[in-house]
């Protein structure tokens, strides 16, 4: 379907009936609309499939496909199911007729090659509707998407009877009204087994549900948003505008690249219909600009990536290059080394006290450069060892040493755990952290290297903590499900973590700390196996699809880095969150407690995670013995 160019808003016009489809399409295009939502059959033409003589009525059932080119049908028309069709009617005759009519309309839309077909959800029980649709999807090989039109609030929940300025009571019954239409949608997509061809077209009314309910909707696969003309207000110049609350919702929908559909009759007689589009364009141009992190992550939204395993694999040059561009991480490392040098070397010793600094996992040298800058800033002397196991990156380090660093830096090619250091270090600096903190085996690496750290030596970072938060996301659940590999267990893809820029999701509760590691590790017996039990309260009806993982780290004293949402280091993009999926979505009721058990396991050769939900219901333990995913030591 036609999408907006660049940042332009993609918009459509919803019409109840079309007499001349080509003329109407042309008129809509002149107004600035990108596509047309229209009935494929005349809305009042109730076909008869069982009784004569109506059953055998001669003549075409609807207009010919020759009225438009195939390209126009494929890109500019969204079909609509006839309103009179009631596939879940308790009256047998109505149900059977509706089934046949729906089948006819679905087949004809597939024949036309429509990009999308609109089906309204008007009640909680849509079992037969879901059966008909999923059968249609499985029988054919068509590319049509199915947009389920669902109001954010059911019509009888709209608060027309509220007295102006009267305080609104938030009793349990009042809140249940906000839940109703989401339950329609959730039941429907569950019956259709989260099929990727079924998406959501929300209808935005004059009244909106509460903020946390809207946030839940934003975790659903929304493709379109219907804006009735009746919800627009009129400003002093006669132009249509929306309330501030509606504007905030529109801004959030822009981020999801939702297409907007204007429905209803023209309520601003002095202005053309295009004034509604002009207003949406105005909102788009005045929406909050993306920050540095969002700019960097553009195109990676909800794209699953396997976590890096730099201990087992040698990284490519381009991978190093991406991480080296981070404007925040290395300035924070520089600040940490700077403060550490000032603490360790008094002013009167700055000419004689040479600190031994070892960069463990030097890569292509960004930490070496940051440390040298810190020493210059602090006016302290350092001797640097740059230890790197990747022989390809060592070539780059030797180039740096030859051209820039000179004898101040010694390049060591080898594994830090096996290196026999000629002297002990005052400071060891490393960047071995993954999206979950310890998932790139920083604990094992630094524990193996701390024997060449002086007794009073400092590790940068000094500690790091992983965090977990329960999330709901149909999009991510389907993305994980699609990762099935031919020769593996059919559910193995649910037993491994993924690095992902979380976008189309809803976080159900605040992150809680999971595992913490300190360096240097002073324990008598070093054991990096871990277990934790985390509990979260859920404040609304929803579905659990997995857990988002984050971390924060203390580099040195008050110098920190974080990817936790509430404390994210501004402008830092070196790490996306990590996702731990679960095999089966778990429905959650308002007030439920999510309890998740998490293990970090190590058998001397590999490290892996195991996880299980134990409340409100028990899931299977995911990834036992590391059968689906391990991290090689």
UniProtKB/Swiss-Prot annotation:
Annotated S-adenosyl-L-methionine binding sites: 320, 329-330, 388, 414-416, 440
Catalytic class of the enzyme: transferase
Tissue expression per record: Detected in egg (at protein level).
Coiled coil: none
Cross-referenced CDD domains: AdoMet_MTases
Catalytic activity entry: L-arginyl-[protein] + 2 S-adenosyl-L-methionine = N(omega),N(omega)'-dimethyl-L-arginyl-[protein] + 2 S-adenosyl-L-homocysteine + 2 H(+)
Catalytic-site annotation from UniProt: 431 (proton donor/acceptor), 440 (proton donor/acceptor)
Cross-referenced PROSITE patterns: SAM_MT_PRMT
Origin: domain of life: Eukaryota
Binding of a protein, residues: 323, 431, 440
Pfam families reported for this sequence: PRMT5 (PF05185), PRMT5_C (PF17286), PRMT5_TIM (PF17285)
Assembly with partners or alone: Heterotetramer; dimer of heterodimer with wdr77. Interacts with wee2-a; this interaction is disrupted upon activation of the DNA replication checkpoint.
Function: Arginine methyltransferase that can both catalyze the formation of omega-N monomethylarginine (MMA) and symmetrical dimethylarginine (sDMA), with a preference for the formation of MMA. Specifically mediates the symmetrical dimethylation of arginine residues in the small nuclear ribonucleoproteins; such methylation being required for the assembly and biogenesis of snRNP core particles. Methylates the arginine in the motif G-R-G-X-G in its substrates histone H2A, H2AX and H4, producing both monomethylated and symmetrically dimethylated 'Arg-3'.
UniProt name for this protein: Protein arginine N-methyltransferase 5
């Amino acid at each position: 379907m036609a999408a907006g160019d660049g940042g332009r808003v993609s918009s459509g016009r919803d019409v109840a009936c079309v007499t001349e489809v080509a003329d109407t399409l042309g008129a809509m295009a002149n107004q600035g609309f990108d596509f047309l939502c229209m009935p494929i059959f005349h809305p009042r033409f109730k076909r008869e499939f069982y009784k004569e003589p109506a059953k055998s009525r001669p003549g075409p059932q609807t207009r010919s496909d020759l009225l438009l080119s195939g390209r126009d049908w494929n890109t500019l028309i969204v079909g609509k199911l006839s309103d009179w069709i009631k596939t879940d009617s308790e009256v047998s005759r109505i149900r059977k007729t509706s089934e046949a009519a729906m089948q006819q309309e679905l087949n004809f839309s597939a024949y036309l090659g429509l990009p999308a077909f609109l089906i309204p959800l008007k009640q909680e029980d849509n079992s037969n509707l879901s059966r008909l649709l999923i059968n249609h999807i499985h029988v054919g090989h068509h590319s049509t998407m199915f947009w389920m039109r669902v109001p954010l609030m059911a019509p009888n929940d709209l608060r027309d009877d509220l007295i102006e300025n009267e305080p609104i009571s938030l009793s349990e019954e009042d809140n249940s009204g906000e839940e109703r239409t989401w339950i329609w949608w959730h039941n429907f997509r569950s019956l259709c087994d989260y099929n990727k061809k079924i998406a959501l077209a929300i209808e935005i009314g004059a009244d909106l549900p509460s903020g946390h309910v809207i946030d839940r909707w934003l975790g659903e696969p929304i493709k379109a948003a219907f804006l009735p003309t009746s919800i627009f207000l009129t400003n002093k110049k006669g132009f249509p505008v929306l309330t501030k609350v509606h504007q905030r919702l529109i801004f959030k929908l822009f981020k999801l690249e939702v297409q907007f559909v204007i429905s209803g009759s023209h309520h601003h007689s002095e202005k053309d219909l295009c004034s509604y589009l002009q207003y949406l364009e105005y909102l788009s141009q005045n929406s909050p600009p993306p920050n540095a992190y969002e700019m960097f992550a553009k195109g990676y939204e909800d794209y699953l990536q396997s976590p890096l395993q730099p201990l087992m694999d040698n990284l490519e040059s381009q991978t190093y290059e991406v991480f080296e561009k981070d404007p925040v991480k290395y300035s924070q490392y520089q600040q940490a080394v700077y403060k550490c040098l000032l603490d360790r070397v008094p002013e009167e010793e700055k000419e004689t006290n040479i600190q031994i600094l070892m960069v463990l996992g030097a890569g292509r040298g960004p930490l070496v450069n940051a440390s040298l800058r810190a020493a210059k800033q602090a006016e302290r002397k350092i001797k640097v060892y740059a230890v790197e196991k990747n022989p390809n990156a060592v070539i780059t380090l030797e180039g740096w040493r030859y051209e820039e660093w000179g004898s101040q830096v010694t390049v060591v090619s080898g594994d830090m755990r096996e290196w026999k250091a000629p002297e002990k270090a005052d400071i060891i600096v490393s960047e071995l952290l993954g999206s979950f903190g310890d998932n790139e085996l920083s604990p094992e690496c630094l524990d193996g290297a701390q024997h060449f750290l002086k007794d009073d030596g400092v590790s940068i970072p000094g500690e790091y903590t992983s965090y977990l938060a329960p999330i709901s996301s149909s999009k991510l659940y389907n993305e994980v499900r699609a990762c099935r590999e031919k020769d593996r267990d059919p559910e193995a893809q649910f037993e491994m973590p993924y690095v992902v820029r979380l976008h189309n999701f809803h976080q159900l509760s605040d992150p809680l700390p999971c595992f913490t590691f300190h360096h240097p590790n002073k324990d008598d017996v070093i054991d990096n196996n871990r277990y934790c039990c985390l509990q979260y309260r859920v404040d609304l009806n929803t579905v659990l699809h997995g857990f988002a993982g984050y971390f924060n780290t203390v580099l040195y004293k008050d110098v920190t880095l974080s990817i936790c949402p509430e404390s994210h280091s501004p402008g830092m993009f070196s790490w996306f969150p990590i996702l731990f999926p679960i095999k089966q979505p778990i429905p959650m009721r308002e007030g439920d407690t999510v309890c998740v058990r998490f293990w970090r396991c190590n058998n001397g050769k590999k490290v892996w995670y195991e996880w299980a939900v134990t409340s409100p219901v028990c899931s299977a333990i995911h990834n036992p013995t590391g059968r689906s995913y391990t991290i090689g030591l």
